[in-house]
């Protein structure tokens, strides 16, 4: 009898606890996960944008830029290496029938390697500002013209597939005239 009572209590606790939580927050698990991952990804984007804005302003030394790039590669969450993790989480929340969002996921899986590779180039630049500037230009080109517009598509796809999730868009570094416009400006 004790085993049956325990089994029923366990079943009731695990079965009914989740819907109660959902009713209390008003969000489905998918909507909550979508919102959490979008917010986390926006934090990551803001950190990378901050670095790119400082690099464009020319207010830090080559050594400082190298150290900041290393931080973006090593620190998680809130860093460049966390963005692919956010991509994978949100890709699982996008409907496979959403061809636009799924194409953006595929693009980002390829493109992120270029951003991370260029951050590594900055870290290993040996305080050579020409190398750093070249790598920053390549990162800006990738982010302004491909990464940020694709992230917007992933955000839209995840939100569309998870009612209750909050719509969001990205913003680029100051050098992006308009993400996806095909141009950026770097001094």
Task: Please place each PLM-identified region on the residue numbering.
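Fungal secretory targeting signals
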Residues: 1-25
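Mature, structured extracellular domains of secreted fungal proteins
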Residues: 18-187
């Amino acid at each position: 009898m004790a085993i049956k009572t325990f089994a029923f209590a366990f079943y009731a606790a695990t079965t009914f606890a989740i819907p109660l939580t959902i009713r209390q927050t008003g969000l489905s698990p998918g909507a909550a996960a979508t919102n959490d991952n979008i917010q986390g990804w926006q934090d990551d984007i803001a950190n990378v944008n901050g670095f790119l804005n400082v690099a464009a302003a020319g207010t830090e030394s080559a050594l400082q830029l190298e150290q900041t790039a290393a931080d973006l590669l090593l620190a998680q969450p809130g860093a460049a290496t966390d963005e692919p993790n956010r991509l994978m989480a949100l890709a699982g929340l996008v409907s496979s029938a959403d061809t636009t969002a799924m194409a953006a996921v595929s693009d980002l899986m390829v493109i992120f390697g270029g951003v991370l590779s260029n951050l590594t180039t900055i870290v290993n630049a040996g305080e050579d500002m020409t190398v750093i500037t070249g790598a920053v230009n390549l990162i800006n080109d990738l982010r302004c013209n491909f990464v940020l517009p694709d992230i917007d598509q992933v955000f839209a796809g995840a939100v569309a597939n998870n009612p209750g999730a909050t719509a969001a868009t990205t913003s680029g570094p100051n050098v992006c005239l308009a993400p996806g416009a095909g141009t950026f400006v770097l001094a």
